[in-house]
Amino acid sequence: MTTENSLPPLKIKDKTAKICIIQGGMGVGVSLSPLASAVAKEGGIGIVSSAALDRLVTKRTGKAHNTYEAALEEISLAKANGGIAGINIMVALGRDYEDSVKGAIDAGADVIISGGGLPLGLPGVKKPGDTALIPIVSSARALEIICKKWERLGYRPDAVVLEGPLAGGHLGFRFEELGLESNRLENLFPLIKEVSLHHGGFPVIV
């Protein structure tokens, strides 16, 4: 039941968030399990940032954690109080990327959100099982490239996050492109939605 001024629930894969809000992955050390767990408990989607997670968990626990172990532990804590929780993993993390993905999936992460580059190989790292895979894009061209690559791996995005030039983080825009009318969210959205519909009709999150 929704009122005129409320957002409908957000359904991704087999999960439904009663509050249509995804708390962003803010690194380093902001989006950790306490924040993600609190958001998930209230009905939104809580997100842990994987940036420097091994060092942060090692410092907090006093026990050495590698990248895989840190993702496994932090996601487990984020999910401990119920609700929907996942992780944001940047492609730019390089060698830590795949270990973060594996740890998150093994911990039962509800979602993996991935940007900071094109996550072309994400579905091939490990069978996601119940974990929803969600790329971050800033253009229809980027999403089309991801969809075609993922389909060759036997997968389609479960949703996509569209970030415009005013978003924080690692954006796909050059400085001179930031003020272009064509890059306003309201102009990017229809193009992204068209690609989504062409590849199965997954949700577009702005």
Where are these regions (language model features)?
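Active-site entrance/lid segments in N-terminal catalytic domains of soluble metabolic enzymes
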Residues: 2-200
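Glycine-rich beta-strand-to-loop/alpha-helix junction loops that act as flexible
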Residues: 203-206
